[in-house]
């Protein structure tokens, strides 16, 4: 099992988004993921989730793993789900993923576990 964690100030993501708008979103979220955004806390949670997912691989966001190799969605109970691209799943021999996202006191945090 490998674990990745990321925490970010919601105000930081909110500031970047207000400055760059959709261009910022397009750099790290697919159109399907952008639909999930309800408020700045949700957006910060998505950022933290992708960062945590890349850290669980032990590489971070880089040429080995881009933001678009990581897909965040919701299940039928509205819980976050994580899916890696086929290439990442194969290269890192991933069989299971687990994602938790939380927001509190101006911060968003995400934890990812992969097997």
UniProtKB/Swiss-Prot annotation:
UniProt keyword annotations, A-Z: Cytoplasm, Fatty acid biosynthesis, Fatty acid metabolism, Lipid biosynthesis, Lipid metabolism, Magnesium, Metal-binding, Transferase
GO cellular component terms attached to this protein's record: cytoplasm
Secretion signal span: none
Enzyme class: transferase
InterPro entries the UniProt entry points to: 4-PPantetheinyl_Trfase_dom, 4-PPantetheinyl_Trfase_dom_sf, ACPS, Ppantetheine-prot_Trfase_dom
Named cofactor requirement(s): Mg(2+)
The protein's Enzyme Commission number: 2.7.8.7
SUPFAM superfamilies: 4'-phosphopantetheinyl transferase
Record's keyword annotation contains Metal-binding: yes
NCBIfam families: acpS, pantethn_trn
Protein's UniProt name: Holo-[acyl-carrier-protein] synthase
